[in-house]
């Protein structure tokens, strides 16, 4: 996963992390500004061998620290973030779906599962 509700978003992390850590992440994950650091990081997660890959919506949307859900041991501003109308577009959904196909993470339909069972 790129994170949980208890840590900053990808974009928030890139703005606040130590420069050496950011440099290392960019090199290790081969990130570039054109694609977006969030998309490169998410692709690394989706491309791993784990059974599950979890990416918060704030990372898909490329939101900074203002999208953080929770700061542990604090009161007042936690659990306030909500997606607003128009943020989740059909173009974004298609982009996510395409990546799910590329990284073999797209959920199979009932028909596809049945076809696999009969092929065995």
Language model features with spans:
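Catalytic cores of glycan-processing enzymes that make or break glycosidic bonds
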Residues: 1-120
């Amino acid at each position: 996963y790129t994170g949980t509700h208890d840590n900053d978003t990808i974009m928030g992390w890139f703005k606040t992390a130590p420069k050496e850590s950011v440099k290392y992440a960019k090199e290790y994950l081969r990130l570039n500004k054109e694609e977006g650091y969030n998309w490169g990081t998410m692709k690394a997660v989706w491309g791993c061998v784990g059974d599950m890959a979890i990416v918060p919506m704030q990372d898909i949307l490329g939101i900074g620290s203002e999208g953080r859900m929770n700061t542990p041991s604090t009161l007042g501003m936690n659990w306030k973030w909500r997606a607003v109308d128009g943020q989740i577009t059909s173009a974004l959904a298609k982009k996510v779906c395409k990546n799910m196909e590329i990284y073999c993470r797209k959920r199979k339909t009932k028909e596809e599962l049945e076809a696999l069972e009969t092929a065995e």
